Amino acid sequence: MRLFFTPSMSNLSIFFSILLLSLPLPSIGDLAADKSALLSFRSAVGGRTLLWDVKQTSPCNWTGVLCDGGRVTALRLPGETLSGHIPEGIFGNLTQLRTLSLRLNGLTGSLPLDLGSCSDLRRLYLQGNRFSGEIPEVLFSLSNLVRLNLAENEFSGEISSGFKNLTRLKTLYLENNKLSGSLLDLDLSLDQFNVSNNLLNGSIPKSLQKFDSDSFVGTSLCGKPLVVCSNEGTVPSQPISVGNIPGTVEGSEEKKKRKKLSGGAIAGIVIGCVVGLSLIVMILMVLFRKKGNERTRAIDLATIKHHEVEIPGEKAAVEAPENRSYVNEYSPSAVKAVEVNSSGMKKLVFFGNATKVFDLEDLLRASAEVLGKGTFGTAYKAVLDAVTLVAVKRLKDVTMADREFKEKIEVVGAMDHENLVPLRAYYYSGDEKLLVYDFMPMGSLSALLHGNKGAGRPPLNWEVRSGIALGAARGLDYLHSQDPLSSHGNVKSSNILLTNSHDARVSDFGLAQLVSASSTTPNRATGYRAPEVTDPRRVSQKADVYSFGVVLLELLTGKAPSNSVMNEEGMDLARWVHSVAREEWRNEVFDSELMSIETVVSVEEEMAEMLQLGIDCTEQHPDKRPVMVEVVRRIQELRQSGADRVG
């Protein structure tokens, strides 16, 4: 039997052939193209440190690569020592990218123009490289961009009006480049903006005046929030007068007068210099003689200051080498408390039933080491004898009178809870204020999370982390229960200390009330501070809840809030977690160390519940945050439900 094709059947077959050719290729083909582009990228930028298994068909399990719907949607390679120029033809194939993070590398040259092919790109983080040239116009076609960070590069040229096309943009960081010209009114709904340390001039547009001065420092810009502009738009460097105009008679005569000094003027200058030098020599001789005649038994603080170690962001306590104390070479003690002279000394004041096994003399004689410098002063570990260790905090910026100090510190000393570091004693004089606490052998939670993670430090599993969270929450709940206005005022991981069994003890409670109102000490807990707090001495209970929520997020992510640059491209930790939780990639939030040791599904469910609690605690509006008693209840319930699931 023979088959005959009629003209209509022939047309129909052609139609279906064209239809098949017009259909999109299977996703596996697109993913293969993505993989090829990623390998080309790695080869071009020296990514030998990227341990990608090229034998895998899919790149979705590679470090820094995230897929969705069979395509690569995110590439996050911060701090991977990448270097060199990104060639054209790579991003043109990664067309489904929504997040690209190449920050803190050594990439150079201009941005590839095919970056404009990534029309779905929402977050672009390129800060901390050496990209140069003008910001390419193709970026302004990426209408879905929400976060753009080009800071810490070598971009030049003017800030283009093309930025106005990025109508969804919320973050724009351009600081520390070589951008020049004036600053345009971008007319964007920006939440974060910075153009500091560029070659910009002119006035700051009204729409950008809502940002603080830090966003514009290191430029020649003027206007709110910087200095007021003159009528011409810039402040002249010197007043213009006839005498300053070259070629005028007055100007020439003035120059001649300035060129010549009379003999009397010269003699006066010489005599003045000799007399001044003589006075300086006499003053120095008196000072040295006075210092040599001083006879006190105090410890010279100037010597110990050489041993004090600054802890960046207060992330960790200082660990001294074994059997070594930071002691003053002229005295057996390293804790400088008071000037002890022949007229006698004041005594330590102990609280409640605290065992008085030592006095101020013992404290002065004790060998000690610096633990770290905190918001309210320097902490020392004092070794009184073979079995007695205490922590001594030497307060700074406390200027209140004896009676007021006594009233406030007695409130602190009366606090008694198993999850608080007990205040055992204090010393007060006009020049020195000392607080004596129990010594916590495991140091702080901050040190445990962000300190040395060598072979000697076991990984922190979820049971330990959630237990620390519960203990700290109970301590704060106790503080809040004492009075409706009672708060900690400085909640952060470095103020959560640990016993040998990892039981949490909250420290530094009540000390915010002691700091002088005129203190210029910078607030070192910015990453923990609630947005409504303007005075560190007046912190509400709901602000404590916010700070504790940041600690919860810190436990879950392993990230330090004080290091804002590392917390997802310049956002603080709380906002970063809020944003990624909305995008539903929670598994990328959790600490990789934690994920590597926890394989039980129930644990991940607990972690997700704790993440939600951390998000609730860090709500922008105080009324939306839970109270501490509710926080304690929720942590108890999620820990109990986890125990029930595993039997």
Swiss-Prot record:
Residues 365-639 form the Protein kinase domain. It is found in: Cell membrane. GO terms for molecular function: ATP binding; protein kinase activity. It is a single-pass membrane protein. Autophosphorylation. ATP binds at residues 371-379, 393. GO terms for cellular component: cytosol; plasma membrane; plasmodesma. The protein kinase domain is predicted to be catalytically inactive. Belongs to the protein kinase superfamily. Ser/Thr protein kinase family. This is Probable inactive receptor kinase RLK902. The lineage of its organism: Eukaryota, Viridiplantae, Streptophyta, Embryophyta, Tracheophyta.
